[in-house]
Amino acid sequence: LGDEGAKVLADYLKTDEKITTINLNACSIGDEGARAIAEALKTNTTITSLEMNNNMVDYEGSGALAQAFAQNSTVELLALSGNYVGALGAAALGAALKENTGLRSLQLNGNDIGNEGCIKLCEGLAARKDKINNLDLGNNSIGPEAGPALRDYLKNDDALTHLNLYMNELANDGCAAVAESLKDNKKIELLDIGGNNIGAFGAEKLAEALRDNDSLVTLELGYNPIGVPGGKALAETVKFHGKLNTMRMGWCKIGKEGGFAFADAIKYSSSLAVLDLRGNDLGDDGVALLEKPKKKKKKEK
């Protein structure tokens, strides 16, 4: 499609009153095409979903879209994953979203927004009266420096149910900040914090927070070196606290001891239905112990 095709489409959308969903994923659209689409959004009142994933939209294009969203309150889903939004584009979106009342889902996976972009975006989202319920910031080079901004935003948010922070660099301090917010946030149902270089300390803080949280249903922690201490802490929490249904902890280095802890936990947990412990070197003994509770439950039916 390219920029020229996007311009033609944008001209049509300025007056169209029927189309509600636009999918422009992987269409080789750059800043010019994004600017044209942005202009159309300023007057269009029927589009509710705009997907422009995996294009070539840089700061200028994302900035133009941000300006449009300061005026448009019809679009509920904006997907810009796999572009070049960067910190400046994220900051522009954050500022625009303070004025926007319609957006409910924002997907910015893989845009290298970094700490500064994340901070500005969180500030904008926190200032909104009408909150979003789905936020994807995975693979964005977000480090522990952005942890306080994430914490402050999440602490006071009463609408977000899905948060994706997969493949960033939050590490222990960033994880601890997010964990702290879970003590107050009673809405998040899915948290993906996998691949963030989180160790035992971060896992322990997360386990502590989950004791006071009854909303989280799915937790993705895979590819974090939480080790045996982190695994044990989470297993102890899962045993009697929270309502986790799905827990994914593949390749977390919890070893046999961590496996034993989870084998004990699932005997008592009344909510856990899916437990992913792939790549944790559980060994035959660890796997055997995990199998025993399953067999026991079958006999009790």
Residue spans for each PLM region:
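Leucine-rich tandem repeat or coiled-coil scaffolds
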Residues: 1-301
